[in-house]
Amino acid sequence: MTLTYDDTSRSVKTEDWNIHYNEAGSQEAPAVVLLHGSGPGATGWSNFKTNLEPLSAHFRVIAPDMPGWGESDPVAKEERDHAKAAVQLLDALGIEKAAFVGNSMGGITTLRLATEYPERVSHVITMGPGSGPQPKLLTPGGGLSEGMKVLVAAYRDPSAESMKRLTEVMTFDNARFATDELAAERAAGAAKHPEHLSNYLDGFARGGAIAQWFSLDALESMDIPTLLIHGRDDRVVHFENSLTLLARIRNSRLVLLNQCGHWAQVEHADEFNRLVTGFVTHN
């Protein structure tokens, strides 16, 4: 059986937000929550549709649209507390603790959850999160990365042409993954919710799109099993950021994937699914 968006689509009212999510797997299995990255047209499904079904053979898998994305509530930057939203989602679904898997922005949220709500987090898995504005040794240039420049441009012009450039900078194997079909899908998703785009750009103009960062110092007292996954060829967030996290989080390990861009869960889906399944099962 191949799971579809409609098969897995759900929604719930939490204390502060209406949250849409996709869910698969037994409700009796350990919970794994997949947190998507930013970008126009991004959703839980768009980021993790190649992972939901394989992981659901072992876990109760939940992939929410975070507030400000997809079918969840639009929010201004000041109201965009994704860690709080994730905890409220657990509460609404009756889940005491979950493994959190976060891509990019979702990885930043996952690290906030681990440091601010550690009692709700069993495992931490990140793919390509930033580590904050501290000086870097290996990252080329300064300021916004090449990928972030393309991403912000796509928010300003969410056309299929812009989305094509975005998918190209997100992936290493453009011929396989940066397809016209994916660009059209992301453009259609972005056009469906123009309020999400304007809220993102407004927040970006006022100090950056990430409303709240984790504390690097707080990572040093983390003792939650942590798996850091990063693409060696990531042009959005350089893998040096995960080296910084590895140095700070004592109970962590790093897997650096060769010939892989910012979407490790897409470009190396089979390996990613094996890594997540093994790590959550055996740690």
Q: Which residues make up each language-model segment?
A:
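Conserved HGGG/HGGXW glycine-rich cap/lid loop of the alpha/beta-hydrolase fold
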Residues: 17-71
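Active-site loop/oxyanion-hole signature of alpha/beta-hydrolase fold enzymes
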Residues: 22, 53, 63-101, 274
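Gly/Ala-rich beta-loop-alpha elbow adjacent to hydrolase catalytic centers
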Residues: 102, 106, 110
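Flexible "cap/lid" loop of the alpha/beta hydrolase fold
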Residues: 115, 122-158
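Conserved alpha/beta-hydrolase catalytic His-Asp/Glu region
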Residues: 156-220
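Short beta-strand/loop motif that positions the catalytic acidic residue
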Residues: 222, 228-230
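Acidic catalytic loop of the alpha/beta-hydrolase fold
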Residues: 233-237
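Catalytic active-site module of serine/aspartate enzymes centered on a nucleophile-bearing elbow/loop
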Residues: 252-283
